[in-house]
Amino acid sequence: MIIAQISDTHLDPEDPKVSSRILDLERCVADINRLDPLPDVVIHTGDIAHNGTPIKYKEALRILGRLRCPLYISAGNRDDRGEIRRHFPQERYLLPDTQFIQYPIECFDVRLIALDTLSETTNMGNFCKVRADSLRRTLAEDCNKPTAIFMHHPPFEIKDSKFPLQFDNQEAITMLSNALEGQCHVIRAFCGHSHRDVTGNISSVPASCVPSVAIDVRLGVFPQSFKTKPVYQIHKYNSHQGFLTETRAAS
């Protein structure tokens, strides 16, 4: 199974100062479409738009609609749940009667579960009892199939960040960690938000962040050849090694 992960596109077609972000995403989508073999799935781990107004999601849909493989999304702190549902109505995984954007994807070699880490009050992450109970129920439905979760906020400390803790408080991280405790079939967590390539753990699950597609807000050290290119990650799964990750610069 091959997963392409993109994140933190921060589209804002109303602000000419950040028009480059549109080109960054277009280049990224074109590069994914040229891959051979194509990924089985693309996951966008949030901050699709720089703030959740309709025109920004319309632009996102225009570009992301060009993908030649299925797209699944988790919401970032800059996103709006209602606008995501309105602009991606054809995707039945975004059910209108759910409070949070959390759902399983069952049709691949690895089961994927999107988690909603939006806080109602800050740009940091949150995870409440409702979301934790939903995750536990979803995990219990299939304890045998390898499973990966994807979410916006990384639930581990990033020491070189201005805000090492990416959640509102440690209690929210503990809520998530407890829900994953003993879930041996959960083999990976994919995150965004930090705008950099960084790894950690949540409970006993290896976790990683993908750099932002938007070059102007990307953080971290990269080869010189990456400087002017949007970056995304390819996660390749096999049953012997689990996930192997490649950070790729779009041409």
Question: Which residues fall in each region the model found?
Answer:
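N-terminal active-site segment of His-dependent metallophosphoesterases
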Residues: 1-59, 158
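Active-site-proximal beta-strand elements of phosphoester/diester hydrolases
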Residues: 2-11, 109-119, 148-150, 205-211, ...
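Active-site neighborhood of phospho(di)ester-bond hydrolases with catalytic His/Asp-centered motifs
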Residues: 5-7, 40-47, 71-77, 116, ...
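Short, glycine/acidic-enriched loop or turn micro-motifs at the edges of active sites
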Residues: 11, 50, 119, 155, ...
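A short acidic, helix-capping loop that chelates divalent metal ions and anchors anionic groups
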Residues: 11-15, 82, 121-123, 157-162, ...
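Short glycine-enriched, charge-decorated loop/helix-capping segments at active-site entrances
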Residues: 16-20, 161-168, 222-224
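His/acidic metal-ligating clusters that form di-metal
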Residues: 28-41, 124-206, 231-234, 242-244
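Extended active-site neighborhood of metal-dependent phosphoesterases/phosphodiesterases
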Residues: 54-136, 141, 172-176, 181-185, ...
